[in-house]
Amino acid sequence: MTLLALGINHKTAPVSLRERVTFSPDTIGEALDNLLQHPLVKGGVVLSTCNRTELYLSVEQQDNLYEQLIGWLCEYHQLNPRELKSSIYWHCDNEAVSHLMRVASGLDSLVLGEPQILGQVKKAFAESQHSHSLSSELERLFQKSFSVAKRIRTETEIGSNAVSVAFAACTLARQIFESLSELNILLVGAGETIELAARHLREHRVHHMMIANRTKEKAQVLADEVQAEVITLPEIDIRLAEADIVISSTASPLPIIGKGMVERALKLRRNQPMLLVDIAVPRDIEPDVEKLNNVYLYSVDDLQAIIQQNLAQRKAAAVQAECIVQQESRYFMDWLRSQSAVNSIREYRNQAEQMRAEMAAKALTAINQGADVEQAINQLTHQLMNRLIHAPTKSLQQAASNGDLERLNLLRDSLGLEHN
């Protein structure tokens, strides 16, 4: 059995190609069914995200499969093979195992060490389970990859340092305040950065969030997801005093939160400290706000400094993580190779049992028909011996006649014979 991983990702293909090779959640089951109709494909998993589309397969053999699988992808997505061939990568066995472990651990991600990919890999695995498309080898590989990703998170610092603006803003808030769960947080805007920040805060059990946006309708979708309250931009002036933390990211050409607005909020708060994180360009918060006592204002440049420092730390952690992947992929390949022996042993035992049953049935028939018992037993054991040693005898003769001493000694070892 051979394991394969093939696909395209953000490193090998532009978004204009990646978007044409994606599988939507409702088509993955159908695609797997279609893929497993190939006589050599015994199991499959389809991983499709905005940054990658990959097939993980267990196959009987890989001869001529490269062209056939690319052809299948192109036919399924109505692409010209020339468009795909220059962007596709192809990994076998140990390389395929290492690749999946790196993907699941975030080592192959656009943002090094990002945790979301593990959830996406688990979802792809679950879809394959649901479609009954998993082979035992693939099931073992994916389960092992999940444990490797967990080990890497536990033993390295790969995921402990924020490397996106949204995560850096949330990390900064957690560093300044001992606990976020009871704080009031105001998010200004409803774009991608604020969406990421809101989800990240929700994961850290923040229960009191307000989302201020120019249009309530867009903000309401996000608010429903993270259980937040929606307010309009003009309402910020009235509600700002409630906020312990403000994270702002809009496309406004002018500041939304001015020094006077913050001063009024501080007065109502009786000068309780406020953290304001402005990740908008142009800035949403007037820079003079920084001059106020009990106000901590951070700009996108401040966060970029944190991100660069954290990215360097992640890269150092990635070296350690790669060593773990190499070690675990070797362990997995040892197991996979041992499965070949297990299957061979099982097949050999079944063959021997079939011979024994046939010989025993013949002997019993002869005895029931009046044959001498001792003679029947001797004949049974003689015939059984001849049938069992027939194949090894031919192999020994062939190795000897070919002068293949290495094979001859290997056969003698396997038969428990001493070397000459």
Swiss-Prot record:
<dbReference type="InterPro" id="IPR036291">
    <property type="entry name" value="NAD(P)-bd_dom_sf"/>
</dbReference>
<keyword id="KW-0627">Porphyrin biosynthesis</keyword>
<dbReference type="InterPro" id="IPR018214">
    <property type="entry name" value="GluRdtase_CS"/>
</dbReference>
<dbReference type="InterPro" id="IPR006151">
    <property type="entry name" value="Shikm_DH/Glu-tRNA_Rdtase"/>
</dbReference>
<dbReference type="GO" id="GO:0008883">
    <property type="term" value="F:glutamyl-tRNA reductase activity"/>
</dbReference>
<dbReference type="Pfam" id="PF00745">
    <property type="entry name" value="GlutR_dimer"/>
</dbReference>
<comment type="subunit">
    <text>Homodimer.</text>
</comment>
<protein>
    <recommendedName>
        <fullName>Glutamyl-tRNA reductase</fullName>
        <ecNumber>1.2.1.70</ecNumber>
    </recommendedName>
</protein>
<feature type="binding site">
    <location>
        <begin position="189"/>
        <end position="194"/>
    </location>
    <ligand>
        <name>NADP(+)</name>
    </ligand>
</feature>
<dbReference type="Pfam" id="PF01488">
    <property type="entry name" value="Shikimate_DH"/>
</dbReference>
<dbReference type="InterPro" id="IPR036343">
    <property type="entry name" value="GluRdtase_N_sf"/>
</dbReference>
<feature type="binding site">
    <location>
        <position position="109"/>
    </location>
    <ligand>
        <name>substrate</name>
    </ligand>
</feature>
<feature type="binding site">
    <location>
        <position position="120"/>
    </location>
    <ligand>
        <name>substrate</name>
    </ligand>
</feature>
<dbReference type="GO" id="GO:0019353">
    <property type="term" value="P:protoporphyrinogen IX biosynthetic process from glutamate"/>
</dbReference>
<comment type="function">
    <text>Catalyzes the NADPH-dependent reduction of glutamyl-tRNA(Glu) to glutamate 1-semialdehyde (GSA).</text>
</comment>
<dbReference type="InterPro" id="IPR036453">
    <property type="entry name" value="GluRdtase_dimer_dom_sf"/>
</dbReference>
<feature type="site" description="Important for activity">
    <location>
        <position position="99"/>
    </location>
</feature>
<feature type="binding site">
    <location>
        <begin position="114"/>
        <end position="116"/>
    </location>
    <ligand>
        <name>substrate</name>
    </ligand>
</feature>
<feature type="binding site">
    <location>
        <begin position="49"/>
        <end position="52"/>
    </location>
    <ligand>
        <name>substrate</name>
    </ligand>
</feature>
<feature type="active site" description="Nucleophile">
    <location>
        <position position="50"/>
    </location>
</feature>
<comment type="pathway">
    <text>Porphyrin-containing compound metabolism; protoporphyrin-IX biosynthesis; 5-aminolevulinate from L-glutamyl-tRNA(Glu): step 1/2.</text>
</comment>
<dbReference type="InterPro" id="IPR015895">
    <property type="entry name" value="4pyrrol_synth_GluRdtase_N"/>
</dbReference>
<dbReference type="InterPro" id="IPR015896">
    <property type="entry name" value="4pyrrol_synth_GluRdtase_dimer"/>
</dbReference>
<comment type="similarity">
    <text>Belongs to the glutamyl-tRNA reductase family.</text>
</comment>
<dbReference type="GO" id="GO:0050661">
    <property type="term" value="F:NADP binding"/>
</dbReference>
<dbReference type="InterPro" id="IPR000343">
    <property type="entry name" value="4pyrrol_synth_GluRdtase"/>
</dbReference>
<dbReference type="Pfam" id="PF05201">
    <property type="entry name" value="GlutR_N"/>
</dbReference>
<keyword id="KW-0560">Oxidoreductase</keyword>
<keyword id="KW-0521">NADP</keyword>
